[in-house]
């Protein structure tokens, strides 16, 4: 009997293509693969990515900022993972020769109503263990001669890097099998046995545990697996311009964010290429990969509108949303927002650049999920909310997911 059960187990091993099947080849999925193989060498990991290369969406379409962690509620996953992740990301980039720079950044109050919020950020930074220097108006010019404000804080641990290069390096170092052009169409799960995933090219990949790092489609993958995610992804497009006179900005300049929203406002970022990116705003997208107003996917719009939380969110935040749409359709309005920080800028200085889409989880009651959200199902781990600062925090996120996965494998 013992011999027979061992034989059955061997057959089962042969039937699996991998131990862990990761859906999503962005920086979080690849960091998870990297963390699994580092923690448990010999674990067979396969990553399925529907695009022809890694990091084609959220990872590769953002400001490229290594965030300090100053914005996030002390004790939250975002605070813990961003603070830790920023240090680790700089070390990872240095180890593998990936372009990066620790530049520091300014957060600038331009109106009196923002001063209490700026002071609250100072306190939050201290609680999160982040060194912060408070500046009066005259001191802002020490860092940014062209920027104007009533007061500011300087955060020295913020930086910039090439997150796409980081993702590629993670893929290489993980030793995982990466299958590009592998769009997932169906997930079949059998209790206690694992999952079988069918891709658009007709392939079937079997694994013991599924990891859902599908970003903009993570809620759909969760439902395919048979798990209720309890949220829905509402896509928000972030539009950028390139500053035609990059000499106006030395480093990174941010406004004081509204704590009611998980968006940081239109900011100025000198990237590793020396160019200065201006943006993003945050407007509802008409497709999950809706990088412009002309991209409309009726099925995805219908999915968003059928979610009660989308309507509740809209009723609660219509005024904020209206301002964001105005800045999207009017370059003059966008320029006006930038001029609050950088008075010298003109409409002619702003050159349209590539946009991004943020995968924002919204609960049924209309709450915008403000922290990273990771949930487990039977033989599955789902990353259901990982927008900014997930790229910064990707190494700690990957380890957190890996711990759960290895717990399932060892159970």
State the predicted function of each range.
Residues 64-139, 149, 265-267, 275, ...:
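Dinucleotide-binding Rossmann-like beta1-alpha1 core, especially the glycine-rich loop
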Residues 31, 187-296:
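Flavin-dependent oxidoreductases
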Residues 12-28, 46:
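Beta1/beta-strand and adjacent pyrophosphate-binding region of the FAD-binding site
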Residues 263, 293, 311-411:
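C-terminal catalytic lobe of FAD-dependent flavoproteins
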Residues 73-84, 108-117, 153-171, 179, ...:
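Short beta-strand to alpha-helix junction loop
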Residues 37-61:
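Glycine-rich FAD pyrophosphate-binding loop
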Residues 153-209, 213, 217-220, 393-406:
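Helical element adjacent to the flavin cofactor pocket in flavoenzyme catalytic cores
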Residues 15, 99-109, 121, 134, ...:
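Helix-loop-beta segment of a Rossmann-like dinucleotide-binding subdomain
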